[in-house]
Amino acid sequence: MLITRLRVPTIKRPLLPITSHLVRHCIRTYVATNHGNVRPFITPYKSSLPVRCLIAQRHIRTFPSNDKFTTKASNIETILLRKNNEREFKQSLLADAKNFQERFKINLKWILIKNNRPFSLNEISIIASWLILSQILWLILSTTTFISFYLFVINSVFSQEYIHEKKIYERLLKWLLKDHKCSNQDLEITFSPEDKASMLVLSPDWESNSILIKRLNVRDEILDLDLKFHHINLNVSLKNWLLGRGLITNVSIYGIRGCLNLSNFINLVNSFQGDQKTENFLKTLNNVEITDSEILLKQSLSAQETPSLKFSIYNLSLPRLRLNHFISDILSAKTFSGSINNSLFNLFKRQQKLTAVIENNNKNRMASSKFDFTDNNQENYRTVTHQDDPNYVTTLRLNFININDLKFNGNGKFNWLKDGQVEILADIMLTNSTSHLSSESKYAVVDLKVTCRDLKTTFPQEPPVLSTGDSIVSLDELKPIITFINSYEGMANPILKDFSENERLTNSIIWNSPNVSINRQRKSYPLTTKVTSNSTKEIIKFHNQPNTNANEIVLRCKMVKNLSDLQLININQILDQITMELYVDLTKIVEDWEFKNKNDWMKQWGTTFASQLLLFGFGAMV
């Protein structure tokens, strides 16, 4: 076999980046085309090149001298030479650069056009279009980061004194609210930083990826609104705005202080539902948090002389807040705790003690149901399991609070109540708003329990009326209710609570009732004993206080409301319905009390009449 010595191409030292896998690929291609016949290797010439390049040179010399392989090898060599020349040219330019700006300009041009020549018109248009598209894409995907970046630029370029002097951020917020139908010239938006030279009132919060607003003051004389916010964290999303969900997604408010007219606030929230600009910003909020806030609520339009209601919010966390489902979303809160005139209230999920038993009952009910719980009927399965889900029932509890604080006796519904305390406990079941049911099938069931203690009444000049002006009961129908409450309050007074209260007992109404009897309890030791060294009183006392709170009237009612009726905040309509239910339950209690008193009187009269007949009969016989 004749072995022909080929002319081996000289591999220069700058061509070191050539890799062995390219050579192996060429060898595999040659072997496949020649059916495995490979020419023997020829000993390479002596060279000072590295071992890797020598191996590559050895493989190249073994290839046949056909035109296809020669063209491919020459193309590879040309590409490698061009890249090496470009790299050497860039290194020479960087070496000649005098400062950082020139080096940055060279590197930037090399990334964009691989040269140091001036930009052409086509290249400038391409770069500008890519910059605009990237900014739009950034604005859609991460709106909060986009706005935070430009806020950072503004705060870095301009001084804070200049920003406060020109009121840049105040004008920006007023411009966002200028098209709202309830906004007017009386709305004042200001910032009150502690140090105007250093305080950033509007700045990015990089840790929480939100926009931070500090020391915001909002005041409106027509709406009777004056609120101060310590700081607010906002998250915005242009993507949600394009989908019709609103621009603002998450809101965290800390430290609200000020006063607010409740009637005007309700009208303001109701007006938001018909305003397109407001819905563009606040249609659906995914997460709302309010912490450490205290607001003085004015309950009437002319509430300057009347005392305000101190409403405190310790912690409020809403997974979602929608303008058209404001009440239902508030009642579906994860956490809602606070106080009303120092009376604590809390909204929480009801805890089931017999969860396992309830789950078994649900399974048995679903097994006996007419629905076929297969993969084809997943909607029916979700419907039944949701209706039987006990965790969806929330409980609202308000501790005992004076009725004068809630203004029950000043709105005309309970104008015959003078004093007392009320405790409210409500179990609320809400239909899942995300279910496939129609809007007519979504409802809210409220099981209300009102506990009244130490009630004091007075006979009014006018009968109680609803907010619409309709009469609830007449004055004649109100008389037995007032008599029952006064008698009930007198019957439940602690008898002989202390020897110093004898004067109070002599004027009590219980001594004017013929059906009152005193049942003394047995002697007992006090729970706690306080004895001083110079005390002459006895340690053991007679305790005649009742063990239970007998001076309590418990009213219960159940109310069913369609969720479509709760889209607008109509407090008067809800209170009117609750008032009617409470009056019905109170009337039943009074009727039972009258029936019991009548039976007791009949028994006593019959016993007295029979005893008199017996005495007169024995006297006649004698």
Curated annotation (Swiss-Prot):
Membrane topology: Multi-pass membrane protein
Membrane-spanning segments: 124-144, 602-622
Compartments, as annotated in UniProt: Mitochondrion inner membrane
Mitochondrial intermembrane side: 145-601
Gene Ontology CC annotations of this record: mitochondrial inner membrane
Residues in the Mitochondrial matrix compartment per record: 71-123
Transit peptide: 1-70
Domain of life: Eukaryota
GO biological process: mitochondrion inheritance; mitochondrion organization
InterPro entries: Mdm31/Mdm32
Keyword line: Membrane, Mitochondrion, Mitochondrion inner membrane, Transit peptide, Transmembrane, Transmembrane helix
Summary of the function given for this chain in its UniProt record: Involved in the organization of the mitochondrial membranes and the global structure of the mitochondria. Also required for mitochondrial distribution and mobility as well as for the maintenance of mitochondrial DNA nucleoids structures.
Similarity field: Belongs to the MDM31/MDM32 family.
Record note on quaternary structure: Interacts with MDM31. Participates in a complex of about 175 kDa.
UniProt xrefs under PANTHER family: MITOCHONDRIAL DISTRIBUTION AND MORPHOLOGY PROTEIN 31, MITOCHONDRIAL DISTRIBUTION AND MORPHOLOGY PROTEIN 32
Descriptive protein name: Mitochondrial distribution and morphology protein 32
Name of the gene this protein is made from: MDM32
